[in-house]
């Protein structure tokens, strides 16, 4: 944000017509227009089970603060257009599957190629101790980082246990087993 890269990308998208200013001053990305070729775009289920149509997405809030989506577009623009990488490979949590089409569409909108983005969707890792799930919550500050994990589990054991699973399948990572595996 401090470098001005996010603002520059938003300005470019406005200039190209991929975004517009809403009445409240927010800058909106025409998500459905650009992302449809990559799949379903941010449709949401209503209370009665039907799906709402895709809506335009906020890039810059009415208060002037950019969303993380705007920063993501700027990151990919920097990587592919400015630094000249041929491909970007992102690893996202599976809960972000609905964002793949809009990101690829945004890349097309700004003059890149959405096909140059590969997204690996990872399922969640459940940590287990004594056969019970380790309860975690980012909101309460009760989380175990990878650094924390590697203080308890040898790195080779962690690598082996993570790599024996496909990215698309959930992992029950047994801390007790990981320590035993190393011995």
Regions found by a protein language model. Give the residues of each.
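Active-site neighborhoods of enzyme catalytic cores
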Residues: 1-69, 75-76
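Catalytic adenosine-cofactor/nucleotide-binding cores of aminoacyl-tRNA synthetases and other
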Residues: 76, 82-183
């Amino acid at each position: 944000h401090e470098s001005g890269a996010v603002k520059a990308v938003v300005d470019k998208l406005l200039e190209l017509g991929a975004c517009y200013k809403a009445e409240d001053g927010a800058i909106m990305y025409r998500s459905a227009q650009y992302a449809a070729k990559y799949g379903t775009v941010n449709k949401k289920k209503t209370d009665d089970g039907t799906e709402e149509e895709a809506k335009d997405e906020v890039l810059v809030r009415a208060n002037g603060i950019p969303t993380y989506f705007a920063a993501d577009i700027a990151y990919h623009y920097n990587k592919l257009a400015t630094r000249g990488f041929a491909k970007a490979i992102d690893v996202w949590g599976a809960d972000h599957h609905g964002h793949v089409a809009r990101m690829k569409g945004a890349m097309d909108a700004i003059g890149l190629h959405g096909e140059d983005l590969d997204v690996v969707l990872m399922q969640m890792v459940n940590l287990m101790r004594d056969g019970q799930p380790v309860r975690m919550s980012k909101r309460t500050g009760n989380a175990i980082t990878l650094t924390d994990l590697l203080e308890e589990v040898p790195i080779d054991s962690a690598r082996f246990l993570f790599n024996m699973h496909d990215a698309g399948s959930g992992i029950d990572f047994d801390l007790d087993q990981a320590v035993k595996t190393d011995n």
